[in-house]
Amino acid sequence: MLIAQVIKKGWYIDFKVSSLVDIPTKYLLYTKTIGEEKYGTDAMCHIVFPLRRMEPSFIRGGYNLPTIDKRKRPNQGDGGGIRGHDIGSVWYSSIIFIRGRGGMVWGCSGTTDYMVPPVSGRRGRVYMVDAKQILKLDIDVDVNFYDPNWLLQKKLDMLHALGYQEEEAWWEYSPSGKHIHVIIVLKDPISTKELFDLQFLLGDDHKRVYFNYLRYSVMKEDAVHFNVLYTYKKSLTFSDKLKAIFRHWFKSKQYSKNLRLGQTT
């Protein structure tokens, strides 16, 4: 699955899709970066942040949490899906915060697959693991001041004190070289909620902990690894965006042709 970051005036949208064609055309020109997810589910999701302050929720009479029944389809008049047509069960919710940048809207659809691709260990081992065995922590520290091996050992000491054991653990520099990634493979899978708790207690990036919890509690995506690890990540060029728009156009033409020929249901 791909993670696309859309930054439009007044909006920030985080799309998780199978291809660029799954992003609405109107957002393609504003897509800044695209990355391929390394671990996670095959659910298609998006989370929208209006970058503007909204009136406090208590003025409007409480939190605004309309929810679409997961049995309904997005083409039944309850709001379009990511592709604008039926893509399976969808959860949608919105909430307005008293403090912060404003409102948020999020949605998710698809299925869950807990098995993740092979993980390469520090000693060259390659094996299949359950996604619920993996902890990835972003440690935002001065890499010139803190010894990564010392940081890793401190995190493992905390893990052991909490009653958990690791199968394998290692650290890596982030692609920017400005902070450290700590990857821990637990001996046994644990529940998603426990993974969230461990992320929080071991000091993971607080924004990702919060996003993961939102996707778990509201969107019902029972997985931690959303927009976390990438096999690659790059900025989208204007040429990339034009190609995606042409693919949108071709797909639309093909659909119209099939519709005329009675080949769609």
Curated annotation (Swiss-Prot):
Domain of life per record: Viruses
Protein's name according to its UniProt entry: Uncharacterized protein 30
Organism annotation: Sulfolobus islandicus filamentous virus (isolate Iceland/Hveragerdi)
